[in-house]
C-alpha cells in the first residue's frame, strides 16, 4: 500500500497503482526479479509495448483505463473517441482552465502532475532516491562540473504514475539548453521498485538540460524514463525564450519521473511538502500548483 499526502484534505490517500500485481511480482519475487533482469528492464520490452500503444489496436484499452482509474475527461482537450491510440490518450493535453498557474515572479510552481518529494541542503554524493537509498548527482548526469554547482542546493523529485497527465512544463520564464541524452535501462519508478533497485535513477534512460530561469537562477532539469517509456519527447526549442508554464516535453506510456535541482539559497519549498518528505511520504501536486517561493 502506497500512501500519498493530500494537501487539500491534510490526510493520506492510497495510491491506485496500475499493474500492481505485475510490479510486486517483478521486484519482490525471485522468479520475477530474474525475468526483470533478463527482459523487462531491457529496451526491447519497452519498445515492443510502446509499438503496441502506438497502434490502433490499443485504442480499445482507453475506456477501460479511464473507468478503472476514474480519470476526469472533462479536463481534456479531446473526447474519448478522438484518440487514435493509447499513447495519444496517455500524452493527452488539458484545457488551460484545468491547471491554473500563478505567474507571480516569486512563486515556484510544480512542473507537472505527480507525487512530489523535496530534499534540501543536498550532498552531491548522497542524493536521496527514496528513504534509505541514495545516488550520486555526478553519475546521474555524467557531468561532475555541472553537478558541483548544485552542492547544498534543493532537489525536487516528481514521480508520475501511468494515470497522471504526462506532460512536463517550465517552472519559470527563461531559456533552456539542448537536452542531453543518456542511455540506460527501463526499471519502474514505482516506490516498490525504488526500494529494491539501488541507484535506479542512474541506471535508467534519462535526459537532462540546464534551464536559466529569470527568478530562480540556474535549474537542472532531469527526465527519467521507466518501464514501457520508450520515448521522452522534448517539445521546446533550445535557447529560445519560454514563458512560465509553457510545455517542455512529455513521456509516452508508463510511469516516469522529473527531477529538478536548484542551487543553494535560491528557493524555499512549502513546509508541508518538506515535512511530509521527512516523514517518508510523497505529496500529490498538479502542474502549475504553488510549491514554494524565492
Curated annotation (Swiss-Prot):
Alphabetical list of Pfam families matching this protein: PS_Dcarbxylase
GO biological process, one term: phosphatidylethanolamine biosynthetic process
Record keywords: Cell membrane, Decarboxylase, Lipid biosynthesis, Lipid metabolism, Lyase, Membrane, Phospholipid biosynthesis, Phospholipid metabolism, Pyruvate, Zymogen
Residues annotated as catalytic: 113, 169, 256
Top-level taxon: Bacteria
Entry's localization field: Cell membrane
EC number(s) recorded for this UniProt protein: 4.1.1.65
Post-translational modification: Is synthesized initially as an inactive proenzyme. Formation of the active enzyme involves a self-maturation process in which the active site pyruvoyl group is generated from an internal serine residue via an autocatalytic post-translational modification. Two non-identical subunits are generated from the proenzyme in this reaction, and the pyruvate is formed at the N-terminus of the alpha chain, which is derived from the carboxyl end of the proenzyme.
Cofactor(s) annotated in UniProt: pyruvate
Modification Pyruvic acid (Ser), positions: 256
Enzyme class: lyase
Site description Cleavage (non-hydrolytic), residues in chain: 255-256
Cellular component, GO, one term: plasma membrane
Catalytic reaction annotation: a 1,2-diacyl-sn-glycero-3-phospho-L-serine + H(+) = a 1,2-diacyl-sn-glycero-3-phosphoethanolamine + CO2
One Gene Ontology molecular-function label: phosphatidylserine decarboxylase activity
Pathway(s) this gene product operates in, as recorded in its UniProt entry: Phospholipid metabolism; phosphatidylethanolamine biosynthesis; phosphatidylethanolamine from CDP-diacylglycerol: step 2/2
Membrane association type: Peripheral membrane protein
Bound cofactor: record note: Binds 1 pyruvoyl group covalently per subunit.
Protein task: Catalyzes the formation of phosphatidylethanolamine (PtdEtn) from phosphatidylserine (PtdSer).
Subunit record text: Heterodimer of a large membrane-associated beta subunit and a small pyruvoyl-containing alpha subunit.
Family: Belongs to the phosphatidylserine decarboxylase family. PSD-B subfamily. Prokaryotic type II sub-subfamily.
Protein name, entry field: Phosphatidylserine decarboxylase proenzyme
Source species: Clostridium perfringens (strain ATCC 13124 / DSM 756 / JCM 1290 / NCIMB 6125 / NCTC 8237 / Type A)
Amino acid at each position: 500500500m502506497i500512501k500519498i499526502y493530500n494537501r487539500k484534505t491534510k490526510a493520506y490517500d492510497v495510491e491506485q497503482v496500475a499493474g500492481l500485481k505485475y510490479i510486486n511480482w517483478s521486484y519482490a519475487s525471485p522468479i520475477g526479479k530474474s525475468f526483470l533482469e533478463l527482459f523487462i528492464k531491457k529496451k526491447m520490452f519497452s519498445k515492443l509495448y510502446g509499438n503496441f500503444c502506438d497502434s490502433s489496436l490499443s485504442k480499445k484499452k482507453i475506456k477501460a483505463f479511464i473507468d478503472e482509474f476514474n480519470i476526469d475527461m472533462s479536463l481534456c482537450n479531446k473526447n474519448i473517441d478522438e484518440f487514435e491510440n493509447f499513447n495519444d490518450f496517455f500524452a493527452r493535453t488539458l484545457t488551460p482552465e484545468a491547471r491554473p498557474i500563478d505567474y507571480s515572479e516569486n512563486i515556484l510552481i510544480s512542473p507537472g502532475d505527480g507525487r512530489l518529494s523535496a530534499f534540501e541542503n543536498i550532498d552531491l554524493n548522497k542524493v536521496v532516491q527514496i528513504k534509505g537509498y541514495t545516488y550520486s548527482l555526478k553519475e546521474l548526469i555524467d557531468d561532475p562540473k555541472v553537478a558541483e554547482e548544485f552542492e547544498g542546493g534543493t532537489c525536487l523529485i516528481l514521480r508520475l504514475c501511468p494515470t497522471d497527465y504526462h506532460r512536463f512544463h517550465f517552472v519559470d520564464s527563461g531559456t533552456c539548453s539542448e537536452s542531453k541524452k543518456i542511455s540506460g535501462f527501463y526499471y519502474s519508478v514505482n516506490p516498490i521498485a525504488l526500494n529494491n533497485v539501488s541507484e535506479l535513477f542512474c541506471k535508467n534512460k534519462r535526459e537532462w538540460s540546464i534551464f536559466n530561469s529569470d527568478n530562480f537562477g540556474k535549474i537542472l532539469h532531469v527526465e527519467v524514463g521507466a518501464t514501457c517509456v520508450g520515448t521522452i519527447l522534448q517539445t521546446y526549442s533550445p535557447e529560445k525564450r519560454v514563458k512560465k508554464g509553457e510545455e517542455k516535453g512529455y513521456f509516452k506510456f508508463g510511469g516516469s519521473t522529473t527531477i529538478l535541482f536548484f542551487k543553494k539559497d535560491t528557493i524555499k519549498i512549502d513546509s508541508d511538502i518538506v515535512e511530509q518528505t521527512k516523514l517518508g511520504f510523497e505529496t500529490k501536486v498538479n502542474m502549475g500548483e504553488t510549491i514554494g517561493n524565492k
